[in-house]
Amino acid sequence: MGSENVNAAGTNRKHILDVDVLSEDEIISILDQTAAMSEVLRRDIKKVPALRGRVIVTLFYEASTRTRISFEEAGKILSADVINMSSSGSSVDKGESLLNTGLTLQAMGVDVIVLRHPYSGAPNLLAKHLPKVSIINAGDGLHAHPTQALLDAYTVRSKWGSLNGMKIVIVGDVLHSRVARSAIWAFTKLGAEIVLSGPNTLMPVGLNLVDGRANVLPPVSVQPDLDEAIRGADVVMALRLQNERQNGGYLPSLREYIRRWQITKDRLSSASKEVLVMHPGPMNEGIEISTEVAHGGRSLIEEQVTNGVALRMALLYQVSAGGYQIEEEHP
C-alpha cells in the first residue's frame, strides 16, 4: 500500500500524502492493519518490537495535541525511537527552510518524518527530495489530513462493518477544512454517499475539483439546510469552525451559526435511529455540537481519539516495516 513510490539508491519507500491516490483495496488493507493494531492496544503489555531500531521524527510547524501525541505513542508502542521536533527552538527559528531541515534529518539517518505544515504541498516537497525517508502527512494547510480521514473511516467501519451505501453528512466549515477534503475521498472510495451542509460562504467553489487538478471527486451533494440534509443520515460529522484560518466575513454571527448548524439531539431525531456522531477535534463544544450530543450515547468522538493511535501504528508499520511479524514484547 501507500500513496506514492520513490525509487532511489535501491530503496522503495512509500509515503502517505493523501487519500485521493489510494485505491479502495489499499484503504481496506490499512483499515485491516488498524484492526490488528487495535488488538495490540488491548494487551496488558502494549509493546511490540516491530519497529525496533527505526527512527521517527514528528516535525510539526503547527500546534497539535491529538495527532502529534498519537503518532508519538504509536511509534513508541512499536518500539521505534521517536523524536519530537517543533519549529520553535530549532534551526527553523534561524531561517532554515523546510527542505534543508528535511535533508538534515535524512543525513542523520531518520527513517520516517511525520510532517504537519501550514503550507499545502509541503509533505509532497519532502517526498520528492528525500529518497531515503518515508513521509507521512499529518496535515498540510487547507489541503489534506489523510490520517484523520482514515481513522474516521476505520471508526465507522468498526461500528457498521462497511461504509457501502451509508449516508454521511459533513457539517460546518468545509472551505477551510483539510479533514473534510480527505474524508470525502476516503468515505466515497468505500461506497458512502456524502452530503455537505453549512453556510454557503463556507462551502468551497468547484467541489468536483481538488486544488485545481483534474481529479474529479465522486458525487457530493450540498444542502445548506441542515434539517433537510440530516434526514436519514447514518453518520453526522461536525467540523470545527477554523477561526485561525478565516479572514472574517464568513458568518453573519456565531449565534446564527449555532441556531442553524449546531448538531443537537432534536436535529438528530430525523436521522437514522442508529445515527452516529463524529468530530475530528479539537471541538468547540456548544458551537458546532451540543454538549448533550458530544457526550451522548451516539457519539464516537472518544473512539476516534482511541482509534487514532491504532491507525497511526498501522501506517508507521506499513511504511517502515513491511512484512515484519507483530509479536508481543516480553519483559
Which residues fall in each region the model found?
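Glycine-rich phosphate/diphosphate-binding loop of Rossmann-like nucleotide-binding domains
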Residues: 61-73, 153, 158-239
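A short helix->loop->beta-strand "cap" motif at the edges of active sites that frequently abuts
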Residues: 131-133, 191-192, 270-276
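Phosphate-coordination loops involved in phosphoryl transfer and adenosine-cofactor binding
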Residues: 51-56, 164-168, 274
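Adenosine-phosphate binding glycine-rich loop
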Residues: 274-275, 280-331
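Rossmann-like adenosine-cofactor binding region
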Residues: 208, 212-292
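Phosphate/diphosphate ligand-binding glycine-rich loop within oxidoreductases
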Residues: 45-154, 285
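Positively charged, low-complexity intrinsically disordered leader regions
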Residues: 1-73
